[in-house]
């Protein structure tokens, strides 16, 4: 689908299975946690501290049991009591304990103590590190509520600046002992990756799930910063999390830094638009501007507590060969980030899964902007045959939430009629449901659109750019054309200037 209708392309073959599957090399051999811990312990140049809060009390145990821990561990501590934890690291806003700021304060405090208490004169060859985590476990009453932060601050050589690798995890198994064991193993994997394989960020990511089940632990955010990772684009790390099956959705902000959904979306009004954005066109901007102006007028929407998301599905990132082109992804991300937008990469082909994802973090009003042709597909029963409750189950998820869909009109060509919710074809069997949603204003037309941009299709713009033909500049926002030209995005090649005649 194209233009205003391109933002929800999905087919029955693209349906996402409920069972999480990780994409790993079957030929790759992995070390056990004990082998990794012993390998670190036997390296006399590695020396550091461990600090663990909450469920995550198991990582350091692997190092003590592996043998040779006295060569590696300067200190291990567990700040289990909340008052003790606050006394050591300081209270967080909202008195939270399992959050990114708490983990960063732990890393800063513990690494600071290393520099304060260990003389570099006495340890001239030591590469110092600090491992920290803060974890809240799941329970049988709330089986998917567990989550936490795990991080490492480390040197790659003595006297070098430090590097940070931070991940966020969600826990899905209600068995607390299994959660503890899995977090312990993942902690060993992360520390081993940072200390041994820091030159290979891809291996750090791959090794996270060595001897850990995706059914128990989901990694939904990773961030690598520091001189050892100057060549790493954290947006590509986000993409890899979804591509590998580690998680189904990731966020990154206008600055290109990865975001954790529970921090970015918590209790917020959310307005999302799905598209390929290849590139961003005038029709995309018309959709978001007019949809936004309607959304902020809603009584239950707080303009100061609103998060706008530009969503790209993994399916929309695939090339004609079925692979994800990372350069093409970065081209799209660069434009969206330059426009000050937060980007969501997801594996949710169906809208009800996207709304269910948002509902983990907020009960406030949500809005989705879509082209009317996409709404036609939303009302196609074939996309819901895998559900026990069929289409009604999916719509129950969609519309039992506080959701409103803003429908942008479509016109296949400049000579054809404009299609809106009033003229959209609906199967007679589904017409009562459709009329109910229209009557209750859960489906609303965007009426203040620009009819002069309805003919713009992203694929048409992309074809013009790649063919080196003129005219595409008029189909994209003013700033975007210069960015495409200046950065040679989407395969743009400047037209050679004509040679001067002799």
Report the location of each language-model feature:
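Nucleotidyltransferase catalytic core that binds NTPs
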Residues: 2-3, 10, 14-502
């Amino acid at each position: 689908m194209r233009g205003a209708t391109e933002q929800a392309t999905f087919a029955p073959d693209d349906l996402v299975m409920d069972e999480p599957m990780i994409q790993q090399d079957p030929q790759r051999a992995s070390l056990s946690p004990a082998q990794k811990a012993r390998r670190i312990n036997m390296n006399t140049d590695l020396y550091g501290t461990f600090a663990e809060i909450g469920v995550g009390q198991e990582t350091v145990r692997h190092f003590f049991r592996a043998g040779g821990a006295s060569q590696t561990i300067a200190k291990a501590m567990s700040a289990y009591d909340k008052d003790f934890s606050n006394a050591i690291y300081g209270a967080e806003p909202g008195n939270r304990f399992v959050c990114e700021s708490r983990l960063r304060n732990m890393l800063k405090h513990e690494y600071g103590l290393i520099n304060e208490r260990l003389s570099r004169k006495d340890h001239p060859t030591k590469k110092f590190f600090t491992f920290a985590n803060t974890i809240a476990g799941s329970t049988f009453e709330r089986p998917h509520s567990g989550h936490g932060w795990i991080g490492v601050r480390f040197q790659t050589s003595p006297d070098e600046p430090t590097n940070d690798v931070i991940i966020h995890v969600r826990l899905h198994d209600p068995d607390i002992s299994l959660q503890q064991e899995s977090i312990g193993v993942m902690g060993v994997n992360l520390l081993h990756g940072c200390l041994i394989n820091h030159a290979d960020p891809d291996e750090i990511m791959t090794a996270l799930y060595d001897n850990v089940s995706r059914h128990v632990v989901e990694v939904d955010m990773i961030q690598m910063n520091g001189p050892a990772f100057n060549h790493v684009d954290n947006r590509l790390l986000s993409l890899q999390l979804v591509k590998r099956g580690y998680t189904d959705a990731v966020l990154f902000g206008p600055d290109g830094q990865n975001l954790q959904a529970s921090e970015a979306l918590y209790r917020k009004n959310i307005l999302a638009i799905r598209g390929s954005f290849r590139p961003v066109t005038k029709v995309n901007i018309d959709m978001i501007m007019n949809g936004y102006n309607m959304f902020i007028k809603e009584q239950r929407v707080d303009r100061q507590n609103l998060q706008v998301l530009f969503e790209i599905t993994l399916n929309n990132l695939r090339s004609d060969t079925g692979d994800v082109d990372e350069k093409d992804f970065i081209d799209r991300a660069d434009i969206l980030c330059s426009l000050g937008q937060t980007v969501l990469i997801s594996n949710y082909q169906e809208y009800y899964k996207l709304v269910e994802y948002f509902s983990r973090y907020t009960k406030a009003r949500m809005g989705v902007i879509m082209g009317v042709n996409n709404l036609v597909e939303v009302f196609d029963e074939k996309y819901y045959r895998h559900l026990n409750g069929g289409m009604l189950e999916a719509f129950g998820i969609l519309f039992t939430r506080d959701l409103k869909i803003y429908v942008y009109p479509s016109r296949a060509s400049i000579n054809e009629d404009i299609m809106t919710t009033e003229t959209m074809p609906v199967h007679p069997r589904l017409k009562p449901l459709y009329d109910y949603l229209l009557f209750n204003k859960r489906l609303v037309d965007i009426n203040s659109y620009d009819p002069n941009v309805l003919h713009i299709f992203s694929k048409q713009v992309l074809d013009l750019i790649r063919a080196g033909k003129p005219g595409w500049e008029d189909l994209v926002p003013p700033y975007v054309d210069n960015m495409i030209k200046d950065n040679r995005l989407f395969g743009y090649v400047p037209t050679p200037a004509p040679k001067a005649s002799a």
